[in-house]
Amino acid sequence: MTVSTFNRTWAKVIVNALLRYGVKHFCIAPGSRSTPLTLEALQLQQNQQAQCHSHFDERGLGFFALGIAKVTNDPVAIIVTSGTAVANLYPAIIEASLTHHKLIVLSADRPPELIGCGANQAIPQQGIFADYPIAGVNLPKPAEHYNAGWLVATIEQACITQSQQGGVVHINAPFAEPLYEADENAINTHPWLKPIQSWLINPQTKWINSQTIQSEVSMHENWDYWRTKRGVIVVGKLPVEQGIGIKAWAETLGWCLITDVQSCVDANLPYADIWLSNNTVHQRLLQADIVIQFGGQIVSKRVNKFLEAFKGEFWQVDEYSDYLNPFAHHQTRFVAKAHHFLRVHPPLRQKPWLLEPLALSQFCAGFIEQQVGGSLNEASLAHHIEEVLATSGNLFIGNSLFVRLVDALCKLPEGYPVYTNRGASGIDGLIATMAGVAKGSGQPTVGIIGDISALHDLNSVSLLNKISHPCILFVINNSGGAIFDMLPVEAQAKEQFYRLSHNYEFAPIATMFGIEYIRPFTWADLKAKLKLAYGRKGVTIVEIKVNDQDGSNLYKSLVKQISQAEIA
């Protein structure tokens, strides 16, 4: 058998092993060295066992895969060639690692004899992602003296680790030339495959039968005591299914419930980022005996300040065993899904122990409406965000100023799926991630990002052409990085090195990539054009042009005024 044919046989085993662990999507960047992997992934697509996607920019491709992984909760494979193509995946690998989303990187490589000798496009790729992957496999160059069962077991073991912990797997796969003109008939019939033939022909069969570790959460030994006390519940980022029941549980206990925009939990005390600026309410909330936090990645600065200031009993509930303790609390940790925790901690019905947050939250609702006004701007879009969403769809929110405005000013419908990249909270790959969420879900998806974020990920506008159902990408154009208007930096330095003001508009970008584009000026105009956008196939870019400091100034003004409100 020729080298090119055995390369394909070797690659076939790799991609078929991934199928057994839920991989249904292969995201592929162009490249020659990865040809064996690419062609075998395409074979799976032809057999209707997987879908293949392509993109010319590995950085965007990584985030596109991340978006699919977020919405499907399945592992997604990424195939790239050797060299800097691999390195361009790093930002997406970091984000996926921090949020436990499942990516499997298949990086093709030069064979060992071409590393460290000046060969073209050959860099050391083993361990290139440092400690971010939860499993790393550095395969040898394909050779028949390796047992086929060994290759299957090696790939499956990495997938088993991922299935238990989430996160990223990196499989580095060297291939020697020639890479082309394989004998298609011989790929599937090589004697080397005989020991694994029954495994290969049955996609449901796993080589390693691993039993999942069962770790049921138990009721805290002092729960009967703590459920009679004064409590505060803080809900960070959670999957939709885990948030169900938290609101009713909190209301039964009579405890204050503070929810993050990523929680998918209906807020009975919305606008917490605003009303917690009031020191009187902040201090009274600190009188709680216990705080229970579900999930992490809290957006609100003032909610985080409350958590930092609280010195009482602190419980952290999260399905992963990560160390989530930025404020060094003396804490009790429950490695459990939120709804499993609720099931074994029955509430005791009590009257609310603190009414001021509810009163101030209700006041904020009317006050924010009054201050935001009827103009179409970033603050009003954040406050009325539910008016631009599809009934059954997804919301993807970018980083920087807008996610803070949404967290502070809006009240989302209970259980509406919200996606973000708040692991490392970077602005890279946001368009690509939104495209992945839309593609992976097949549901109408609204993405909202800032202008600098859009400029940072312009290549990924190309990915929007892969979406055939109605989706909306809002670009909030405040002519620069308005988030930095919040910083106490000298004006000239802020302008030149933080804000980076510009006069760019996004209509030419939409034209270049063949994407529908609208630029509304009023809410009536926006609603009329959105109705048309939701009635046609594909993505529409909506550019909202706003004055550069309006959003940040309103945000600061709301915080200041509520902080000074007199509380009886």
Curated annotation (Swiss-Prot):
One of its GO terms (biological process) is menaquinone biosynthetic process. Its cofactor is Mg(2+); Mn(2+); thiamine diphosphate. Binds 1 thiamine pyrophosphate per subunit. It catalyses: isochorismate + 2-oxoglutarate + H(+) = 5-enolpyruvoyl-6-hydroxy-2-succinyl-cyclohex-3-ene-1-carboxylate + CO2. It is an enzyme of class 2 (transferase). Pathway: Quinol/quinone metabolism; 1,4-dihydroxy-2-naphthoate biosynthesis; 1,4-dihydroxy-2-naphthoate from chorismate: step 2/7; Quinol/quinone metabolism; menaquinone biosynthesis. Keywords: Magnesium, Manganese, Menaquinone biosynthesis, Metal-binding, Thiamine pyrophosphate, Transferase. Its EC number is 2.2.1.9. GO terms for molecular function: 2-succinyl-5-enolpyruvyl-6-hydroxy-3-cyclohexene-1-carboxylic-acid synthase activity; magnesium ion binding; manganese ion binding; thiamine pyrophosphate binding. Catalyzes the thiamine diphosphate-dependent decarboxylation of 2-oxoglutarate and the subsequent addition of the resulting succinic semialdehyde-thiamine pyrophosphate anion to isochorismate to yield 2-succinyl-5-enolpyruvyl-6-hydroxy-3-cyclohexene-1-carboxylate (SEPHCHC). Belongs to the TPP enzyme family. MenD subfamily. Homodimer. This is 2-succinyl-5-enolpyruvyl-6-hydroxy-3-cyclohexene-1-carboxylate synthase. It comes from Actinobacillus pleuropneumoniae serotype 3 (strain JL03). The gene is menD.
